[in-house]
Regions:
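SF2 helicase/translocase NTPase motor core
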Residues: 1-30, 35-148, 153-157
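Short aromatic/hydrophobic "clamp" motif used to bind/position activated sugar donors
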Residues: 161
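Conserved phosphate-coupling serine/threonine residues in phosphotransfer and NTP-handling enzymes
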Residues: 165
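Active-site segment of extracytoplasmic enzymes that catalyze sulfate/phosphate-ester chemistry
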Residues: 168
Length: 174
């Protein structure tokens, strides 16, 4: 399974075990406490799927306070050298063949039509080879909220989905 995966940064044992458990799953939740390396595990998971030729695009939806931190984290932890990283409101997404393409977006943007439109275009074109990562998934705990509905609808056709949180959800969005 992941035993031949070459990490760029050495994982702690709990991170290695988390990757082993979730690596091949279509849908998986990384429920790990704050500061235990959920982001690194998710990046390794995306890179492993890319190396298996299962994905070429990753959408990261994260709170405004952290979504741009993903740029530094991807560069720090990704063993894939051919990266194309785009952040919503900074870069427009331009797919690069032969690269692992990352698109980072603030979760708040998905409460608005403009943010939804950007992700619709990406998901329509790359859904069969795409992974969606929802960082701090508790931001969609209310299934009747517009943002939650938009994220669930956009994620439906995507092949691989991951949610990350250090806090359990009080209301299930499903």
């Amino acid at each position: 399974m992941t035993k031949h995966y070459k990490y760029k940064t050495k994982p702690f044992e709990h991170q290695r075990q988390a990757l082993i458990q979730g690596a091949e799953k279509r849908n998986f939740a990384y429920f790990m406490e704050m500061g235990t390396g959920k982001t690194k595990v998710a990046i390794d998971n995306a890179c492993w799927l890319y190396q298996q030729n299962k994905i070429c695009t990753v959408i990261v939806i994260a709170p405004n306070s952290v979504y741009r931190n993903w740029i530094k984290e991807i560069k720090t932890h990704s063993p894939v050298s051919d990266l194309n990283i785009c952040a919503h409101k900074v870069d427009s997404f331009r797919y690069k063949d032969g690269h692992l393409n990352w698109f980072l977006i603030n979760v708040e943007a998905l409460s608005h039509t403009s943010g939804v439109r950007v992700l619709q275009e990406i998901t329509q074109n790359y859904f069969s080879s795409c992974m969606m990562i929802l960082d701090e998934s508790t931001t969609i705990k209310n299934r009747t909220a517009k943002r939650s509905k938009n994220i669930c609808k956009l994620g439906k056709p995507i092949q691989y989905k991951r949610i990350l949180t250090g806090s359990p959800i009080t209301k299930s969005p499903l």
